[in-house]
Amino acid sequence: MTDAAPNQPVNESQELSKSFEPAEIETRWYDEWAKRGYFDAGRHVETGTDPQPYVIQFPPPNVTGTLHMGHAFNQTIMDGLVRYHRMLGDDTVFVPGTDHAGIATQIVVERQLDAQKVSRHDLGREKFVEKVWEWKEQSGSTITGQVRRLGASADWPREYFTMDARMSRGVAETFVRLYQQGLIYRGKRLVNWDPKLLTAVSDLEVQSEEVDGHMWHILYPFVDGPQTITDQDGNTVTLRGMTIATTRPETMLADGALCVHPDDPRYKHLLGKLVELPLCDRNIPIIADDFVDPDFGTGCVKITGAHDFNDYACALRHDIPLIVIFTLDAHINENGPKQFQGLERYEARQAVVAELQAQQYLVKVEPHKMMQPKGDRTGVVLEPMLTDQWFVAMSKPAPAGTLNPGKSITEVALEAVADGRIAFYPENWTTIYNQWLNNIQDWCISRQLWWGHQIPAWYSEDGQVFVARSEEEAQEQARAAGVSGPLTRDPDILDTWFSSALVPFTTFGWPEDTPDLRRYLPSSVLVTGFDIIFFWVARMVMLTMHMTGSVPFKHVYVHGLIRDADGQKMSKSKGNTLDPVDLIDGIDLKGLVRKRTFGLMHPKQAGAIEKATRRQYPDGIPAFGTDALRFTMAAYATLGRNINFDLKRCEGYRNFCNKLWNATRFVLMNTEGHALDGDGGELSFADRWIVSQLQALEAEVERGFADYRFDNVANALYRYVWDEYCDWYLELAKVQIQQGTPAQQLGTRRTLIRVLEAVLRLAHPVIPFITEELWQKVALVAGKRTAGAVASVSVQPYPRANPQAVDAEAEAAVAELKSQVEAVRALRGEMNLSPAQRVPLVAEGPTDVLSRNTPYLAALAKLSEVEVVAALPDAGAPVQVVGDARLMLHVEIDVAAECARLDKEIARLEGEIAKANGKLGNASFVERAPAAVVEQEKARLAQFSETLEKVRGQRVKLGV
C-alpha cells in the first residue's frame, strides 16, 4: 500500500477491509517476511542468546516437477512445526532443495526430443545433458515458486540442487570412501531392467500389477528314454519326460536345469539324469533344491538363472550356467535358436509356443492370474536381466578405521532405532522399518542413464578400475599402478536415491567439518509419507551414520497419502488429481478440463476424464486461499492413515477464515480508540471464562505439536474460535459493552482484544497469512506493538498455558448459562416461534443465578423480558428443566390450531417411517442397493422416529 509506513506493509490508519481477500495479503506478506530475514537460520543467535536448533529438511521434490497434493500436505506440516518452534525462540533451519530426479527428468526431455523426431543417441551424451540442464534452468523454479505460495518459511539462501557443485562433491566423496572400504563393489547380478529406458531400476520402483495370463505345460523328454516313477497315490507311472509349467515359455530357451525337491520320493532316482531342452540343441540336468514346492503342479520347475530372481539364486547354489537370451531392449539374442533371433520377447513367445505345439512338446495351456512387474515411470513390463552393476554392500561388516568397525551399515541403522536415538511417529512404523532392514539385499546403485551423477570410476584398456574423486586423481592412481594408456570413465550414473540419502549432512557442508554441520546435524524431525520409508528414510540413516557417526534426524513423522474423496489414489491417468495452486487461486471448468486431459499417456482416456470432471466440478474450483488449504491439510493430519481429500473441507475452513476476519472487525470496532494497553477494569464471569478456556486451548495445542497430532491442533483452534469465542463470547461481550459499568466495559474490551491477539499467535503456524494481517491491527490496540514499528506475529512469543488463569467457577457459571440459553432455544423450536419474535420468559429457581444470567438470556435467546418467580404458573405450556431452574415461555397460543398442526405433523412423520420401514424390510433393496444408500435410509428412519417422539410429547403437553 503506497501510504504505509516505511518497511511496514500495512496502512495502520486504514480500517480493516470488509472482506478477507487472501490473494493480495499472501503475496505481500511472504515477500516481506523473506526480506526481513525471519526465515534465516541463526537470526536469534545474533542477539547473543544460544537457543536450541530446530532443523527440518525438505524431502527434495523433482526439480522439473510441479506441486501435488502430497507436497501441500507435507509442506503444511513441516512449515507449521518450523513456525511454531521459531515462535518458541528456537534457532529454526528449514532447508529447501530440489532433486535432479534422474529417470523422471530424462524421460521428460526425451519426450520433447521425440516430438522433434530426435533421440538422445542422435545428440550424443554431452549435447543431451546440455539439453537437460537447459530444461532444468527453464522450469526448475516452478516448483519452488509453488512451495513459496504455500507459505513455506524456508531458509532460501541455503537452497540446494542435488547436482550442484557442493552436493556433487559430497556424492563423489561418499562413493570413493565406501569403495575404498570395500562397501561399494561392481559385479554381475540379476536386476530389474527397463527395456524401454535401457536401465536397471530399483526393486522399490517396481509396480506389480495383477493380469490375466496363461500357464503353459511343456514336456522335457528324458535323454535315456521313458522313466518310471511312483506317484503320490502309490501307482507306478511311466513318463516320457518331465512336465513343467511356466508363464513365460520364451525364457525356456535359456534354461540351465530342471529342479525338484530333494525329499520328493517320486523323483529321487532321477536326480542327475538329463532331459532334452525342447527347440534347443542341448541337454540339461535334473537337480534338487528345497526351494521347490513338491505339491505345486508336477513338483518340477525349470531353472532359468539369467531371467528369474528365484532361479538365479538356485543356479548360483548349483553352478548352473547363466544363459542370457535377451538383448537389452528385450529381443532374442544370438544365444537363442536362429529361428527366434531378433524377435521381440512377446513375438518370440508366440513363435516358441507355436513350435512347441508343432513338435508335440506342449501338453496343455491354462488361464492363470499372475503378478506382472512394471516400471513405475514407463509402465513397461520389466525384465530380470543379468548385467554388470555397482552395488552397496548392505550386510558386510565395515572395516577397521571406519566409525562403526565390525558392523554393517544395516546393523547400525537398526540399532539407532532400537536404542531410541531415532523414534517413529506413529510407533508402529518401527516394525515396518525393522522388517525391511532385516530382509535387505545389496543396493544396486548404478543406472544406465545419462542424466545424474556419473559414477566416479575410470577403466584402463586392460580392464583395471580406478575409483577417484576426479579424473586427475584416477590418472595418478593409474600411473602408480603402472598403467600409462588412456582411461575411460564408467558411463553409468548413480541411483537418484543415493545422492538424496546424503542430504542430511551434505547440505551443511560435509565433507568439511563446518560449524553448520556441528550445529544442525541431526535434524529435529523428518516429515514423510510411508511410501518412501525404505527408498529414502532407511538409506539416510545408513549413510549418514556411516559417514558422520550421527543419526540424520531424531524423529520420523510418517503420514498417510492423499487420495481422492472416494479413496482412490490420485493419478494423471485417472484424471482425479488436484493442483494445490488451483485450490489457492481457483480455476474455471475449461482450465481444469484442459489441465487434466493434457499430456495423458493414454489419450483415449481424455473423454471419460473430461466427463467426470464436468460432473464433479461443474463450476470449476473456487479460490480458497493458502490459509484455508493449510488448515484443511492440518485437520487431515491424523497419525499414519491415508487421507480421502474432500473439497468441501476446504470450503469449511475458508468459512473459518472469514469468521475470524469478521470477528476481528467486530472486536476492533469495539476496542479501537480505547486505552487498553494497561491493567484495570472489572472482569465479568464471561471474561474470566473465555480466558480460562484459552488456557485449555493453549495446553491442547502444545500437546498436539509435541505429539505430531496436527489434527488435534487444527480442531482445537477451530472449536475455540468458532464455538467459544465467536458464537458465545462475542455475544456475551456485547451485553457487557452495552449494559455494563465503565469498569466492566473496560474489562471486557481488554479481554476481547487480548484473547484475540493470543489466538492469532496460536493459529499462526497453521494459517500464517490471515493471522499476520489481523495481528498487525490487533497488536496495536492490545499494546503488543507500537505504531510505525516493524513487527511480525511470526517472531512473537508463542502463547503458553497459565494454570493460574484457569477459573473453575467461571467455567461452571458459563456452562450453566449455555444450558439455559439452549433450553430456551429448544422451547422456541418446540413452540414453532419465528427467530424474530421476542417473547417473555418466566423462570423459577436460584434467584442469584437467574438474576445474573437475565441480561445474557434476554440477548442470546431473543427474549422481551425475563421474570424470576417463586413458582411457574400452571399454564399448560412446555417447560425446560436446567439444574435447579425451570424455564417456561409465556406465550399465548391458539391451542386448537397448534393441536391441529401437531396432528398433521405426526401423520406425516408416521407416513415417512412406514415408507422407510418398507424399504428396509425389502430384502431385494437391502441386498442390491449400495451400502451407503442403505445406511442413509437407516439414518432417515432414526431421524424420523426421534422427531416423532418429540412432536408426540408436545402434543401430550397440550392435552386437548
Swiss-Prot record:
InterPro entries: aa-tRNA-synth_I_CS, aa-tRNA-synth_Ia, Anticodon_Ia_Val, M/V/L/I-tRNA-synth_anticd-bd, Rossmann-like_a/b/a_fold, tRNA-bd_arm, tRNAsynth_Ia_anticodon-bd, Val-tRNA_synth_C_sf
Compartment(s) where it occurs, according to its Swiss-Prot or TrEMBL record: Cytoplasm
Location, primary (coarse class): cytoplasm
Motif placement: 'KMSKS' region: 569-573
Coiled-coil residues: 893-958
Gene Ontology MF term list: aminoacyl-tRNA deacylase activity; ATP binding; valine-tRNA ligase activity
Complexes and interactors: Monomer.
Family indicated by similarity: Belongs to the class-I aminoacyl-tRNA synthetase family. ValS type 1 subfamily.
NCBIfam families xref list: PRK05729.1, valS
Annotated protein name in UniProt: Valine--tRNA ligase
